[in-house]
């Protein structure tokens, strides 16, 4: 893999005169327009780009201020911001449920830590590869997908990633509303009377709490990616302190912890489950492996990505695993039963004040996870689909509305939806990753003509055939079929936890064979058509 500097504006780009206002593009007809303003939509690059010779004509069907590359100068995501992103997402209630499930399946404390460590090591490497793509090009995931799949074919990976996210946005908001209901009833027991009826599957109190959290998230998104960055930065320490304190409280109550159960696995069965756990941990982050560039396009340097990933993935995951082991082991020591989530422990806190504090922290956590994992991806996917009509806020509002009207609480209660619809979509993520990562690192060797990602000229690099790269599709489809078969066909149940790896590996190998490896690729900076980053 070619080495590349932290940020890669071309020398000619650096010599361009800076705009009069550091956050204002050269737009004489829209002098008031800032990138962080959520309402106007800018369909053309800054006027200064017209003075740059050789730039292709930008299509308004492919470009607006949210899809445009970000300028190198002014990027705000530091190593701490990357770490805070992982501090929130790794410690999600769903992930704790997964880790606690490993305990219930027969793995002891040290085996769980080894399993998570294996998965974290793989993720650190893969997420660094994905993250470097973002800082090099400055583009979001739907635009990044144009490199391998074509300017129109990119809708396939963007919409698959967005569909998974928008459904989980609704489900995670519903799960957060359950925590809020517990909190409100603890403060005012009389509210329990509002929790017995059913309106479209949700009680009156359930509707009030869901809509409240829905509105809170929409308000945060109203102010763009920079507000999300700030929220994650503050939420991260709150989550770590709260969950660590919860683990200490449980350990104190139990006096010690059970590092294993009487029927813990040993020998080959134990090691199989260890590797299964590591593989599933990677699969959980299959979504982030695709669209991590949505965040790293605003990173200050490659060093900040590596540092943020190192503290946020291997070390933070081990801390997460230790907390999970203490919570599970202490609860098993106390009652002889397993817990499914830290929320189960919070409900047992005898002190109302401490219960309220813990419940609020879990709400902060769930919102933080939802914003980064399930809100950003569909926003960019929808913006890429309708760039002339949607920007970051409008797409965010549309995503939120979809997440509401699908009545996610009913979907969550349906095993068919969770296992087959979401599981099926998730099974497609590995093949997408295999094609995209192989094309960028092995075929093009990081040489990307960024301005041509925004032109629909038939002679452009990423137009392929009618805007779709048939070789990428030819590699993706068979790999996706194999991955889905491994995930769902009972015959392949012993290897089903590894379906992501099969899909990614087959797609990567197929694309490497099918792609044009002898073509000369050119590295052209997107700086002339970039807009200031306020993220």
Model-derived regions, located:
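Transmembrane alpha-helical segments of multi-pass small-molecule transport proteins
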Residues: 158, 185-222, 237-246, 274-292, ...
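Selective recognition of specific alpha-helical transmembrane segments in multi-pass small-molecule
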Residues: 118-126, 160-172, 237-252, 280-287, ...
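Membrane-interface loop-to-helix entry segments
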Residues: 160, 171, 177, 208-250, ...
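Hydrophobic, membrane-embedded alpha-helices of multi-pass small-molecule transporters
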Residues: 77-95, 209-216, 247-254, 263-327, ...
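Hydrophobic alpha-helical segments and their helix-loop junctions in multi-pass secondary transporters
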Residues: 173, 177-186, 237-263, 284-285, ...
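Transmembrane helix-boundary motif of multi-pass solute transporters/channels
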Residues: 59-149, 153-156, 166, 287-314, ...
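C-terminal membrane-solvent junction of multi-pass transporters and transport-like membrane proteins
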Residues: 69, 432-513, 517, 522-528
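Membrane-interface "cap" regions at the ends of multi-pass membrane proteins
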Residues: 37-109, 243-244, 253-254, 265-278, ...
């Amino acid at each position: 893999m070619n080495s590349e500097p932290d940020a890669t504006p071309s020398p000619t780009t650096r010599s361009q005169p800076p705009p009069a206002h550091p956050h204002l593009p050269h737009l004489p007809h829209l002098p008031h327009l800032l990138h962080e303003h959520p309402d106007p939509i800018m369909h053309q690059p800054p006027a200064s780009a017209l003075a740059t010779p050789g730039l292709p004509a930008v299509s308004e069907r492919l470009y607006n201020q949210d899809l445009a590359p970000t300028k190198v100068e002014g990027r705000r995501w530091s190593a701490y911001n990357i770490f805070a992103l992982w501090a929130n997402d790794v410690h999600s209630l769903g992930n704790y449920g997964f880790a606690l499930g490993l305990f219930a399946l027969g793995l002891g404390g040290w085996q769980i830590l080894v399993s998570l460590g294996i998965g974290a090591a793989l993720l650190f490497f893969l997420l660094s590869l994905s993250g470097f793509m973002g800082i090099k090009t400055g583009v979001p995931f739907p635009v990044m997908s144009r490199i391998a799949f074509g300017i129109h074919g990119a809708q396939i990976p963007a919409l698959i990633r967005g569909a998974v996210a928008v459904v989980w946005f609704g489900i995670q908001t519903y799960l957060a509303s359950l925590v809020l209901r517990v909190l409100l009833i603890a403060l005012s027991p009389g509210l329990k009377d509002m929790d017995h009826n059913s309106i479209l599957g949700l009680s009156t109190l359930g509707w009030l709490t869901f809509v409240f959290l829905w509105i809170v998230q929409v308000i945060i998104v109203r102010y763009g990616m920079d507000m999300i960055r700030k929220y994650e930065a503050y939420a991260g320490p709150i989550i770590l302190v709260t969950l660590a304190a919860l683990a200490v409280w449980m350990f104190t109550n139990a006096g010690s912890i059970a590092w294993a159960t009487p029927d813990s696995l040993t020998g080959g069965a134990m090691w199989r489950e260890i590797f299964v756990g590591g593989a599933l941990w990677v699969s959980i982050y299959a979504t982030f492996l695709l669209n991590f560039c949505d965040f790293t396009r605003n990173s200050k340097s490659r060093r900040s990505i590596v540092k943020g990933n190192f503290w946020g993935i291997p070390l933070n995951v081990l801390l997460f695993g230790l907390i999970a082991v203490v919570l599970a082991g202490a609860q098993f020591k106390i009652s002889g039963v397993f817990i499914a989530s830290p929320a189960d422990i919070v409900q047992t806190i005898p002190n109302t004040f401490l219960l309220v504090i813990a419940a609020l922290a879990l709400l902060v956590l769930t919102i933080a996870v939802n914003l980064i994992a399930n809100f950003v991806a569909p926003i960019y996917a929808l913006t890429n689909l309708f760039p002339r009509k949607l920007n970051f806020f409008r797409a965010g509002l549309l995503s939120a509305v979809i997440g509401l009207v699908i009545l996610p609480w009913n979907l969550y209660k349906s095993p068919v939806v969770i296992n087959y619809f979401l599981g099926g979509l998730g099974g497609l993520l590995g093949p997408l990753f295999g094609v995209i990562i192989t094309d960028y690192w092995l075929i093009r060797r990081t040489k990307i003509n960024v301005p041509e990602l925004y032109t629909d000229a038939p002679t452009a690099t990423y137009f392929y055939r009618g805007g779709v790269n048939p070789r990428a599709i030819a590699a993706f489809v068979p790999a996706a079929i194999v991955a889905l078969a491994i995930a769902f066909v009972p015959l392949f149940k012993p290897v089903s936890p590894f379906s992501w790896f099969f899909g990614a590996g087959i797609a990567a190998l197929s694309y490497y064979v099918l792609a044009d490896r002898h073509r000369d690729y050119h590295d052209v900076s997107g700086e002339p058509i970039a807009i200031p980053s306020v993220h």
